[in-house]
Amino acid sequence: MTLLILLRHGQSVWNQKNLFTGWVDIPLSQQGIQEAIAAGESIKHLPIDCIFTSTLVRSLITALLAMTNHSSQKVPYIVHEERPDMSRIHSQKEMEQMIPLFQSSALNERMYGELQGKNKQEVAAQFGEEQVKLWRRSYRIAPPQGESLFDTGQRTLPYFQERIFPLLQQGKNIFISAHGNSLRSLIMDLEKLSEEQVLSLELPTGQPIVYEWTGQKFTKHAPSLG
C-alpha cells in the first residue's frame, strides 16, 4: 500500500484576519499551530518516506509540527537542492532516522496579485461579491496581476508528475504540506474533477486527505486509515 497524504497548512495569522495571503510569507496563528499538531496526530501511524512543502513558512512549519509525534520517531531534514552538500548526511545510522523534506515554489499558494494583504470583506464591498467570487473560485479568471486556479495548476501539476509521482511509483509514501489552491489543482487532477466540480471543492486548514496509489489509480481514504 503506497500512500499520498495531502495537508493544507494550519490557519495563518492572515487567515485569522480574513486577508488575502497568496505568496506573502505569513506564519501560523496559535490556532494554526494546534491544527498542525492535531493533523499530525491523525496521521502519526501512517508510513511517510518523503515530505514536500512549498517555500512558504506556513507550509513548512505545518509539516514539521505534524511530524513531531509521528510513530516512526524519524526527524525531517530539509534538503537544499541548490547546494546538496549542505544537507548531506555522512552517517548511515543517522540517515535511517531521518525523512527528507523538499521545498518548491511550484507548491506555493496561488498568487493573489493586487489583492494580497487586503481584507476579503472590504474587497467584496469595493468590487462586488460576484466579482470577488469569480476571482476566488472560478477556474480561469485571475485577480488583477494574480493567478487563476488554472495558472496554479500549470506549475503544481508538472512538479507533481516530474518529482513526486515517480516516488509513488517506487512505493514511497509521500506527505505534501501545501495550500488551499495548489492542493485543489492537484486534487482536481487526482480525482478527475471537471472545471465546474472543482469550484465547490473546499479544503479546511489542518485536515489531512489520504490517497492510496494502487499502481493504476488514486483511491481516497479517511485519515484514520492509520
From Swiss-Prot:
Residues reported in the UniProt entry to bind substrate: 8-15, 21-22, 58, 109-112, 120, 136-137, 180-181
Molecular function as annotated in GO: phosphoglycerate mutase activity
SUPFAM superfamilies given in the database record: Phosphoglycerate mutase-like (SSF53254)
Gene3D superfamilies linked: Phosphoglycerate mutase-like
Active site location: 9, 109
Family in the record: Belongs to the phosphoglycerate mutase family. BPG-dependent PGAM subfamily.
Function text: Catalyzes the interconversion of 2-phosphoglycerate and 3-phosphoglycerate.
Name recorded for this polypeptide: 2,3-bisphosphoglycerate-dependent phosphoglycerate mutase
Organism: Chlamydia trachomatis serovar D (strain ATCC VR-885 / DSM 19411 / UW-3/Cx)
Name of encoding gene: gpmA
